[in-house]
C-alpha cells in the first residue's frame, strides 16, 4: 500500500508561474522519506497539497487513498503536520496546547492527558509542561510543535526541517523518535529538508525536487546507480608514486568498483605491482554527490 501518491500534480499561485510541475510520486507505507530540495523548490507547496491546505491546479493526490481536496477532515485525522505555519497558542501552557490539539483531532480528554504526558516526557519537556508557550525557548517550542504533530498518533507524519534551531542533544532525541516511529510504530514520515548529510543518516528513501520538478525518487542505491555515483576503491601511496588508470583526489588514488568484495583482489594487485600502500579504503558515494548529480543533469537538459 502506498501511504502517499501524486499523479501529474501541478500548482500555480498566480496562473502563470508553476510552483510545482507535473509531480508523479509514490511513497510506500512505513520508513522515512526524505523530500530534498533548496528553499523555493516546492517542498512546502507539496505538503500543503497533500494535507488539503491547497488544491492542485492540475492532477490529483492521495494519502492512504483519501483525497485531501475531497476528504480534508479524514486526511487530517490520520496525518500529523509540523511546519513553520503550524502555530500553537502562546498564552496556553505546553500541556494545555497538546490537550487542545488532541481534542481538536477527536481524542477524548483522558486519552489526551495520557498522550500529552507521554510526548512531553519523550521530548524532554515534562518539567516545562505548566509553563506558558510564550516562555519556551526556540528549541523547546520546536519540540512541542513535534509533540503536537504526534498527539493523534498519525499514520503519516509531515515534517518540515524538524531539527532547525535545535541544539545537538535535542536534535538527537528528535531523530531517535522519528526513527522509532518509522521502525517500530509503522508511521510513514515525509521529511522535507535541504540538509543532505542529516537526510542520509535518517531516511530510507528520497525524492529530489528542484525548481518545482521532481528529478528522481527511490532508495539511495537506486538513485546512486541511476546517476552514476559508484563505490570507489582508494589507496594512499608514498609521494611521487602513482597508479595507472586511477584518479588522484585529495591524496587518494581512486577507481570505481562495482562491488565491495572486489577490494581485496584489487589491493593484492596493487601490492603485487610493487607499490607500497600506506592505507586502503572503500569510498562510498554521499547523498550530496547524488543530489548534485541530478541537479547538474537537469541544468544540462534545460
How should each PLM-predicted stretch be described?
Residues 153:
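Conserved catalytic motifs of ABC-family nucleotide-binding domains
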Residues 176-258:
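ABC transporter nucleotide-binding domain
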Residues 229-298, 302:
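Short, charged/small-residue-rich alpha-helical element at the C-terminal edge
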Residues 157-160:
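Catalytic Walker B motif of ABC-type/P-loop ATPase nucleotide-binding domains
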Residues 99, 103, 110-128:
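Conserved ABC ATPase "signature" region
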Amino acid at each position: 500500500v502506498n501511504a502517499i501518491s501524486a499523479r501529474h500534480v501541478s500548482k500555480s499561485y498566480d496562473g502563470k508561474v508553476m510552483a510545482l510541475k507535473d509531480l508523479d510520486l509514490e511513497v510506500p507505507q512505513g520508513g522515512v522519506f526524505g523530500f530534498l530540495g533548496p528553499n523555493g523548490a516546492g517542498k512546502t507547496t507539496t505538503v500543503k497539497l497533500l494535507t488539503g491546505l491547497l488544491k492542485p491546479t492540475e492532477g490529483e493526490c492521495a494519502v492512504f487513498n483519501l483525497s485531501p481536496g475531497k476528504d480534508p477532515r479524514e486526511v487530517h485525522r490520520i496525518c500529523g503536520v509540523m511546519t513553520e505555519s503550524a502555530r500553537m497558542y502562546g498564552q496556553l501552557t505546553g500541556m494545555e496546547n497538546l490537550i487542545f490539539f488532541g481534542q481538536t483531532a477527536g481524542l477524548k480528554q483522558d486519552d489526551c492527558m495520557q498522550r500529552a504526558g507521554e510526548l512531553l516526557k519523550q521530548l524532554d519537556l515534562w518539567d516545562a509542561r505548566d509553563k506558558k508557550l510564550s516562555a519556551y525557548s526556540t528549541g523547546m517550542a520546536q519540540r512541542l510543535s513535534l509533540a503536537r504533530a504526534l498527539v493523534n498518533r498519525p499514520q503519516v507524519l509531515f515534517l518540515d526541517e524538524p531539527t532547525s534551531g535545535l541544539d545537538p542533544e535535542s536534535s538527537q532525541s528528535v531523530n531517535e523518535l522519528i526513527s522509532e516511529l518509522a521502525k517500530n510504530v509503522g508511521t510513514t514520515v515525509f521529511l522535507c529538508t535541504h540538509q543532505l548529510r542529516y537526510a542520509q543518516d535518517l531516511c530510507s528513501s528520497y525524492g529530489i525536487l528542484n525548481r518545482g520538478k521532481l528529478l528522481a525518487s527511490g532508495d539511495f542505491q537506486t538513485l546512486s546507480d541511476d546517476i552514476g555515483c559508484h563505490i570507489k576503491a582508494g589507496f594512499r601511496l608514498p609521494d611521487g608514486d602513482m597508479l595507472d588508470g586511477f584518479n588522484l583526489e585529495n591524496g587518494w588514488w581512486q577507481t570505481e568498483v562495482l562491488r565491495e568484495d572486489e577490494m581485496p583482489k584489487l589491493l593484492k594487485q596493487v601490492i603485487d605491482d610493487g607499490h607500497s600502500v600506506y592505507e586502503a579504503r572503500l569510498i562510498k558515494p554521499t547523498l550530496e554527490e547524488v543530489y548534485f548529480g541530478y541537479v547538474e543533469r537537469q541544468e544540462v537538459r534545460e
